[in-house]
Amino acid sequence: MAKERAILHCDMNCFYASCEMAYHPELRDKPIAVCGDPERWSGIVLTASYPAKRMGVKTGMPLWEAQQHCRDITFVPAHYDLYTRFSGYTREIFLRYTDQVEPFGLDEAWLDCTASQSLFGTGEEIAKKISDTVKDELGITCSVGVSWNKTMAKLGSDYKKPDAITVINRQNFEKIVFPLPASDLLYVGKKTAAKLDNYAIHTIGDLAKTRPQFLQEKLGKVGLLLWRFANGLDSDPVAKYEQREVLAPIKSIGNSWTTPRDLKTDQDVWIVLYLLAESVAARLRENHFRCRGVEVSLRDSNLFIFERQMKLSLPTMQEQEIATAAFTLYKKHYHWSEHLRSIGVRAIDLQPDTEPCQISFDFSAEKQEEMERLESAIDGVRNRFGYYSVQRAVMYKDRLLSHCDARADHTIHPHGYLQGSI
């Protein structure tokens, strides 16, 4: 019989606010809210500290409303370089216990500690070690769920906050999980929760006890998936951190980002696509490749993922051409049933930059060489003086979305159960 898995889900508590308080001890135990631009009252709260939350301040709340709830609140501008650095520190701690670490944004990650138990103790004991280490070394807290699969582990980390460990096993999961709202389950967004409500399915227990055929009829294949999750049937593996075959040839180069707020307009999407295309193009040049195709992946606020790709008329390593192709795919295939939460851009069908290619009549080798020299020069400036030393004008249209070094902040996202479902 296979050994029962020990899966952990670690969730940093009020992550942005916690990083600010760790970096600025004078803010500790005070009501603070991290926001994009404190000078703009049209801005929103990205994260609030627990003292602010107790006063009614919530994520996504306009700043003027947050101040009505909490008169002495301190608004702090977001510092994504700081949060990325802290995120890297947490992952270094996780990797002391297992190489199977699957990040979920900057502040969450799954760990498979099954094989680590002989060295470090039970899953619960490892969770305690990680929690204590994060607190001692970084000055922030995390909540950890321990279970036999990823779904239950995530429900465990959400169950008690802050600074808590919750074990959900096969013996107690119905008692703990079944009374929880169905919306707490992974992949149940607002629209899906509303549909379930219409069928008197209000809790995870209700979902688990509903006939799977009925759920499939009403929700499609996601209905069966949710039924399995509600019943603890999740065998999805935890990916190895930055898993790659070192000796294998590079077949594609990509970057993805979970944005600090939902993307609601074409301009939002263009800014993020261009940001990612810059990173992908720079890595193509660094590795001496051109790409003959571009792939875009979109994840909406319900966590559904779909991917589309297209061939290019000519191989390229230019960010403008990659961004334009990605935006074309997005415009053609995405119809805004939900806001977007994450975007990925990938250069595919690679060829060495020394390989000759067939050109068209309107192709200008001189113009291509000029653009490639320009972008290589920008790479050199950024390598010496930092990413933000040179930026495109489009990046100043929304600093909240564009203030990210996509190469440094690259995040691995979990495997999409619902690839191609949109």
Task: List the predicted regions and their residue ranges.
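Gly/Gly-Pro- and Ser/Thr-rich, intrinsically disordered tail segments characteristic of DNA damage-repair
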Residues: M1-R228, V238, A282, A365-I422
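DNA-contacting surface of Y-family translesion DNA polymerases
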Residues: H9, T192-L340
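Short Gly/Ser/Thr- and Asp/Glu-enriched loop/turn motifs at secondary-structure junctions
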Residues: F104-E108, S147-K150, F289-G293, E338-S342
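Short acidic, glycine-rich loop/turn motifs
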Residues: G36, L298-N302, D349
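A generic structural signal for short beta-strands and their flanking turns/coil linkers
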Residues: R28-K30, R71, I140, R290-V294, ...
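C-terminal hydrophobic structural anchor segments
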Residues: E321, F327-R384
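Short, hydrophobic beta-strand segments
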Residues: A109-A115, E307-M310, P352, C357-F363
